[in-house]
């Protein structure tokens, strides 16, 4: 079941975040996101196994964070969660932006399947645990067939 994130989900969401990110968000950041962002979770057998945080901004949105528990990856849950979360955006965005580590090929494939495409590369953006840095792939999904709306 996919539903809106609740404050009682924050511990589970933060635990998943720690499993998949080298620089995870804090519990406080997740709690603050509940106020101003659209936060959804994927729940199976009363257990949160994934989450998605979208930031609506005027007529656009930013995908800030998304993760599926490693034991549940590769089962289509991420695509279902992303698709549902985008459909629930109340601002009907013209475009949705995201950035992802260049090495995160599984996430890039998921985003491409969800109709995102690369528009830029932010060099040396993400810090790695060993002190090196990694490029961020900037992607966008256009949510309108009205080409003129992109330039208003």
Segments predicted by a language model, with ranges:
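Conserved beta-strand edge residues that scaffold enzyme active sites
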Residues: 31, 103, 125-126
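Acetyl-CoA-dependent GNAT
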Residues: 4-71, 79-89, 142-152
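Conserved SAM-binding loop
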Residues: 2, 100
